[in-house]
Structures are given as C-alpha cells and as structure tokens.
Regions:
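Exposed alpha-helical structural elements
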Residues: 49-52, 67, 146-147, 156, ...
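A short, Trp-centered hydrophobic/proline-enriched beta-strand micro-motif
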Residues: 4-14
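Flexible, solvent-exposed short loops/turns enriched in glycine
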Residues: 128-162
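Generic detector of short alpha-helix boundary/capping microenvironments
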Residues: 5-6, 125, 169
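Aromatic-patch recognition
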Residues: 14, 19-142
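Long, compositionally biased interface segments
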Residues: 151-193
C-alpha cells in the first residue's frame, strides 16, 4: 500500500464538529492523499468530509478540497500547503521496469524467469506535488494567475511578485520557492499598510 510512513503511527485528528480524536494507527494514503487507519486487520479510509486537521508527531495536515495538505510554512494566518499524490503512471512504469523477465531458448523449451527487484528499502514512490496558499483568509492553488488575481493592486507588490517568480532558481514546485514567495508578499503587504 502506498503510504507516507512505512508503519502506521499515532495522530491527533481534529473533526469539523470541533471534536478531537487520538488515533493510534494512522497513515497518509498517497494515491489520493487521504487519511487511512487500521481497524483490526483491515485498512480503512477515513471520511475526509468530517476531518479538519491531522497532526502527526512530525507534520501537520489540514484538509483542502477533501485531501490532506501538509503545512509547509506560515506567517500569521497566511500559509503554504503541499498535497502529495502518487503519480500512478510513473508508479506503474517503475514497477514494470523493476521486474526483470528473461527468455532463454533451450532447444524446443523456453525458460522464463521473473525476478522482482522491488525492495522496500530501495523503493521510492514517484510523487506529484500540488501547492496551495492561504492568503487573506482565502485558500487557492499556487499558480501565477491565481496569486496575481489576489494581490493588492499596489505597483510595488506586483513588481516584487514578478521579480521573485522570474528569479533564477525559482520553481512553482519547490517548498522553498513557494515559501519565499509567501513571505515576500506578506512583508511587502505589511510595509504598504
């Protein structure tokens, strides 16, 4: 099963009705970035409509569009989140590439052997990252056009935005770049007030 952690681990789950649950055996299912938990010998998928936040010992997730979004950075109430998905096409290709099939002709006989080269230690799940920004109380996908629409009409803020996103090394798929962008927007917005 494609999960974030090798082993299921404890978490604190905050529900939309205000209740708080301590769950011993939970994990993040990477196929659709949802919470899964163990109930006896069964792995169950949580109803994401009832969950507001999940806290593991090393990460915090808020639910955005029905998926667990990891909190990457925050300044006050403004935040950057990342949703990690399993890239199913790359995953299938990786599985196929890691199986070695050889056909050796021995007269009229064909010997076929299959060796599974997938070991848990070596195997890395191919992930796709989607970023979200919470700015001025509104949560939206991190995309140039989406951010531009929500920026104040101030020339300095818009110039700073263009400068950052055209800077060498900036990437829309990098935690550091997206965090830097959020912090710059917040700092310039505060100096303009």
């Amino acid at each position: 099963m494609a999960t974030l952690y090798r082993e299921f681990k404890p978490s604190v789950i905050y529900l939309t009705n205000g209740k708080k649950l301590n769950q011993n055996l939970t994990n993040v299912f990477l196929k659709n970035s949802t919470l899964v938990y163990l109930k006896g010998t069964y792995t169950m998928e949580a109803n994401m409509q009832t969950i507001r936040r999940v806290e593991f010992d090393d990460r915090q997730y808020d639910v955005i569009e029905g998926q667990l979004a990891e909190l990457i950075d925050s300044v006050g109430n403004d935040c950057v989140y990342r949703v990690d998905y399993l890239d199913m096409d790359a995953y299938q290709a990786q599985l196929k590439n890691n199986i070695n099939i050889s056909n050796i002709s021995l007269g009229d006989q064909i010997s076929t052997s299959t060796v599974d080269l997938n070991t848990e230690e070596d195997f890395k799940f191919p992930l796709v990252h989607k970023y979200y920004m919470c700015y001025n109380g509104e949560t939206f996908p991190v995309h140039e056009r989406e951010i531009w629409r929500r920026l104040p009409k101030d020339k300095d803020i818009r110039r700073m935005f263009k400068t950052i996103i055209t800077k060498q090394g900036f990437s829309w798929t990098s935690d550091e770049s997206v965090s830097e962008l959020l912090r710059a927007i917040i700092s310039v917005s505060k100096t303009e007030q």
